[in-house]
Amino acid sequence: MTEITPGSHGQGDSPPPGSPGASPNVGPVRDSVADLPPGTPTGAERATDEATAAVVGARRPLDIGQDIDLPAGTGAATVGTPTLLGLPQTRQVVQPAFDEHHPPDPALIGDCVHCGFCLPTCPTYVLWGEEMDSPRGRIYLMKEALEGEPLDDSMVRHFDQCLGCMACVTACPSGVQYDKLIEATRPQIERRYERSRSERLYRDLIYNLFPYPKRLRALRGPLRAYQASRLGNLLTRTGLMRKLPAPLQAMESLAPKLGPVERVPERTPAVGQRRAVVGLLAGCVQGTFFPDVNAATVRVLAAEGCDVIAPRRQGCCGALPGHGGREEQALDFAKKTIETFEQAGVDYVVVNAAGCGSNIKEYGHQLRDEPEWAERAEALARKSRDISEFIVELGPVAERHPLPMTVAYQDACHLAHAQGIREEPRKLLRGIPGVELKQLTEAELCCGSAGTYNMLQPEPARELGERKAAAVLATGADLMVTANPGCWMQVATTLARMGERMPVAHTVQVLDASIRGVPVEELLERALTGPGTALARPTPAQS
């Protein structure tokens, strides 16, 4: 029976999978399987499994309860008596990587045919070319874990290095739901794997600060004082900044310029005839660090005929802890958000942060196990809209004044990939007289923000930020526009670190300026120097 290897084109043996020049389509394809007994793996299936196993070192599944020597911190339970020094013996009983509470679905894992179309869209595979840092490699690791492999340091590292950008979901011709798989894996890691003490402390800091608007607002005063003192410049010049742990350096550099808080009214009436009553999700980071975006959102919605209700007692929607695998915390936030907007009595909930919008639209799935919440969660998910999605759906009626400028629109992953919203923001920007859109190269590639990724994985995030910043600069545009606060901070900070000055704004701020007749020069100046702009300092090599 003849076997051919895709990508060889009759020019001899193709390079081994995972090596430079290898085709992403791993494995031979048979011309017929009619003579194979039922259940026999095809050549493609056998070769793919063999190739992937070779990449991961031919790790074989372990029997549950099997004794094996493992380093501490693998998530396995230690057995036996302590040594004389009080340290545990190294003989450990291997526990299954995943518990029974919603592990990755084997049926979804089986949907992956290892075709490789995801590889050029995966940020970590693009950076390193490592099979296990690709979607299909991580799916293979999930399969291993389901078969009994423990959650060791290496496996967890590959999962942690995934940005969760969902570009692979967009690229996959087989419709593999990698988003569901990685979102099921992260809570398992948080429950089953013991991280180092320093990492636990840092993660606790992030997830006990950023999802809490009151705590963030309390931080504004000290942070503004720090920015005004220019202490950061001194720390950078003396080299002391480089002595901080990389995650703390990343957190310090990402903080945008803070200005006065522009709080939106609890209720804003429509201009002219009322067309809808909408609720505004203020957001945690958006509401604290980018209050101008919320103010612009309210003005645009009112101009388009909407009564806007911004509930005072709203909090985090659960996106940040949810993406970090902190399931219990995320579900608690989700329930509070549902109650808040049920009480508000709105027709729609409008969101101006891509990560928050994609999370709310998954409430029904997240709360599927709780009968008293499942239907309510699905109801809120159905009425949630991104600001650009909502205005296009409603139909814009407010007059647009000219803004003669070129715009580089940067797709936020959780808008383009997670929600499938690409054309709506572009349509709204093109509807402004004088605006010319510029296309970015590698538009599908994540900028490296990915929720808390740029604080937890600063090195790959920095590399991805530099690629995105270079792509933005290459357009020669007057203004970069995006739809997510994380993307804004990531790209703006990278541009500043590179010594480049480029204005950055949210889509709705451009719409607001056009509706209000703000001169283009004023818009660009505020986007370059106003609140929300980057304060990162050029690296020493460029200063």
Where is each model-derived feature located?
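Cys/His-enriched microdomains
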Residues: 110-116, 120, 160-163, 167-170, ...
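N-terminal glycine-rich, Lys/His-bearing helix-loop that initiates the first secondary-structure elements
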Residues: 3, 8, 19, 55-56, ...
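Iron-sulfur cluster-binding cysteine motifs and their immediate structural context
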Residues: 111-113, 117-139, 161, 165-188, ...
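Non-heme iron-sulfur electron-transfer modules
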Residues: 80-98, 125-157, 175-204, 500-508
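Iron-sulfur cluster-binding electron-transfer modules in prokaryotic oxidoreductases
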Residues: 3-6, 178-543
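A broadly conserved sequence feature marking short terminus-proximal activation segments
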Residues: 3, 61-91, 118-142, 414-417, ...
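Short, charged low-complexity linear segments at domain edges
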Residues: 79-104, 132-153, 271-277, 291, ...
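N-terminal intrinsically disordered, low-complexity tails
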Residues: 6-81
